């Protein structure tokens, strides 16, 4: 693999640079869907879980035993399941959306395409950035990245990034008389980049994500003539993947 001009790549690719991402990447990967054509990211019940569709191709079931049709890569590392697909990456250098099968370059589970998140590398110079967000529904987000000066004769650079997402529950449960869907995510990453020679580069990154968010709220409703309602369009829970609602004659 090597970097190429996107105009020379014989494939359908959308690429977003850091400037674009800072304006659109508010909380997680769902924000990318609005700036890339043919891409739909549908959040599912589990925290950080999503069913991703490119050109209408997706895997409806997001159980860990199933492989997604659209793959998620972060820094070249494949994320094997739909769980935690909604990355909360803050210091992304760019995000690439490749449409169509990508088995030649990326291997299996890329029938529909893939989303590749490439984070920025340690710069070796002291500096950083911070982003503070306050919004309705008690949303309070803090994101920060710090680069440290290089050591070992300038060959070893390090970087630390941290994210704290809190609040943002906009569902009201009338029965419980409380807000539902509150977000509570704490994550950080430590990255070290070692360049012992001009021809050798070694990067090691440690990530830790603690997601204590509420389970995503869903609506239960019925059609005329139905006794029970199921989660919105997730009838597969009762073995009925083609129809919404649990039909019963009474």
Regions found by a protein language model. Give the residues of each.
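Short secondary-structure transition/capping segments
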Residues: 53-57, 171-172, 215-216
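Acidic, small-polar-rich N-terminal luminal/periplasmic segments of exported/outer-membrane proteins
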Residues: 1-125
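Residue-level signature of outer-membrane beta-barrel architecture
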Residues: 74-76, 148-150, 192-195
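Glycine-rich, histidine-containing beta strand-loop boundary motifs that form or position
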Residues: 43-45, 162, 204-206
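Outer-membrane beta-barrel domain signature, strongest for Gram-negative TonB-dependent receptors
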Residues: 177, 182-250
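Structural signature of outer-membrane beta-barrel domains
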Residues: 2-4, 59, 135-137, 165-169, ...
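Outer-membrane beta-barrel translocator/receptor signature
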Residues: 50, 67-69, 81, 90-99, ...
């Amino acid at each position: 693999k090597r970097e190429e001009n996107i105009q020379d790549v014989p494939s359908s690719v959308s690429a977003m640079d850091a400037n674009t991402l800072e304006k659109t990447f508010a909380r997680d990967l769902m924000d990318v869907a609005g700036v890339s054509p043919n891409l739909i990211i549908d959040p599912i019940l589990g925290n950080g879980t999503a069913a991703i569709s490119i050109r209408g191709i997706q895997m409806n079931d997001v159980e860990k035993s199933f492989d997604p049709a659209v793959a998620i890569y972060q820094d070249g590392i494949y994320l094997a399941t739909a769980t935690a697909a909604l990355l909360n990456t803050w210091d992304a250098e760019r995000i690439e959306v490749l449409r169509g099968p990508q088995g030649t370059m990326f291997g299996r589970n890329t029938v529909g395409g893939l989303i590749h998140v490439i984070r920025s590398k340690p710069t070796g110079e002291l500096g950083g950035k911070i982003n503070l967000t306050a919004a309705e529904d008690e949303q309070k987000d803090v994101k920060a990245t710090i680069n440290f000066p290089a050591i070992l004769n300038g060959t070893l650079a390090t970087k630390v990034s941290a994210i704290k997402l809190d609040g943002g529950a906009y569902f009201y449960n009338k029965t419980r008389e409380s807000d539902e869907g509150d977000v509570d995510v704490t994550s950080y990453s430590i990255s070290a980049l070692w360049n012992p020679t001009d021809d050798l580069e070694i990067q090691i990154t440690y990530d830790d994500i603690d997601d204590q968010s509420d389970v995503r709220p869903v609506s239960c409703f019925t059609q005329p003539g139905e006794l029970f309602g199921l989660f919105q369009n997730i009838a597969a829970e009762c073995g009925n993947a083609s129809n919404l609602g649990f039909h019963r004659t009474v």
